UniProtKB/Swiss-Prot annotation:
Record's GO cellular component terms: COPII-coated ER to Golgi transport vesicle; endoplasmic reticulum; endoplasmic reticulum membrane; endoplasmic reticulum-Golgi intermediate compartment; Golgi apparatus
TM regions (residue ranges): 95-115, 120-140, 193-213, 215-235, 236-256, 271-291
InterPro entries: Surf4 (IPR002995)
One Gene Ontology biological process: endoplasmic reticulum to Golgi vesicle-mediated transport
Gene Ontology molecular functions: COPII receptor activity
UniProt short sequence motif Di-lysine motif, positions renumbered to this chain: 299-302
Organism in which the protein naturally occurs: Schizosaccharomyces pombe (strain 972 / ATCC 24843)
Membrane topology: Multi-pass membrane protein
Official protein name in the record: Surfeit locus protein 4 homolog
Length: 302
């Protein structure tokens, strides 16, 4: 008579199934986080050869709207002068003078930004032109233009943040030293907050034609904007916004499909290049990161 082990009656298969079930449940809870991290690692590996060129591309796209605006004014000089003189009431030769100043500041400032020369003066001149044109063309009260200009200014803030080096300046004895790194941090925070104004403008503009696809895109956009503002997985969600905005820009603002004689062609072209500037700001954010005031940086500390 053979003896039976007291453990032989334990249903091993049930224990294995139960263990596998518990293990599977544990894995499912981490699936999204693990997949997101894996996707980001793969994306960084894929983009590694292009990373050195990202800052240059970002700066060029940020100022693309200024290049386009300057070229448009030059190629349409008689029409622009006539509009400013007859409709905006710029008399006594001030109309061509105003346009000339805008063209020079936009071309010189944009070129300096692209090549990282005299950044403070270049960004200051572009900010001045942005405000000057808003008043001159009577767009200061336009809600849509306000959101767009804020987004473009956000991109310029990110470029400005890159000009501050890590050093401390003590101008007055007995007072705390001023950290250039802190200035850079504040500009990075302001830049990424202002960048999302573009999406707020789009959401406010699209009040009709509700569909499930549009609702899903809006939810994804709002979520990504919130993550960029607080700085949680900011690079990943900024890349998501780049994808959404790029696709929407080529679909909505396809000025090349509008006849040349149509008056709407210039409006579509202006919107297209201004949206490209915001895409450039987001690309710059993808490259530089959210900065010190962000959840991502706090996680590194704690």
């Amino acid at each position: 008579m053979t003896s039976r082990s007291p453990f032989s009656t334990i249903p091993l298969s049930m224990n294995q199934d139960s263990y596998q079930t518990r293990t599977t449940v544990g894995i499912r809870k981490k699936t999204f986080s693990e997949r997101a991290c894996q996707f980001m690692e793969q994306a960084e590996t894929f983009m590694a050869p292009f990373t050195p060129y990202m800052p240059l591309l970002g700066r060029f796209l940020i100022v693309a709207t200024y290049f386009e605006d300057a070229i448009r004014i030059v190629t349409q000089w008689p029409e622009q002068v006539s509009y400013m003189r007859d409709y905006r009431r710029f008399r006594f030769g001030t109309a061509p003078l105003l346009l000339f100043v805008c063209v020079v500041l936009m071309l010189v400032g944009s070129t300096l930004v692209v090549f990282k020369k005299r950044q403070a003066y270049a960004i200051g001149s572009l900010l001045f032109v942005t405000l000057l044109q808003a008043f001159a063309y009577g767009l200061i009260t336009s809600g849509e233009m306000f959101f767009r200009n804020m987004s473009v200014i956000g991109g310029l803030c990110l470029v400005a943040s890159d000009t501050f080096i890590h050093r401390r300046i003590n101008r007055f004895a007995g007072l705390p030293a001023v950290s250039e790194h802190n200035k850079r941090t504040y500009f990075q925070l302001a830049g990424r907050v202002l960048l999302i104004f573009m999406f707020l403008g789009l959401l406010a503009k699209e009040g009709s034609g509700i569909s499930w696809t549009r609702i899903l895109v809006h939810i994804l956009s709002v979520t990504a904007c919130a993550m960029v503002v607080i700085g949680f997985k900011a690079k990943f969600f900024a890349a998501v916004l780049v994808l959404i905005l790029s696709v929407a820009n080529f679909i909505i603002n396809s000025f090349w499909s509008v006849p040349r004689e149509s008056p709407y062609r210039d409006f579509y072209r202006y919107d297209f290049f201004q949206t490209l500037s915001i895409v450039g700001g987001l690309l710059y954010l993808v490259n530089t990161g959210p900065g010190k005031f962000s959840v991502d940086e706090k996680k590194k500390i704690y």
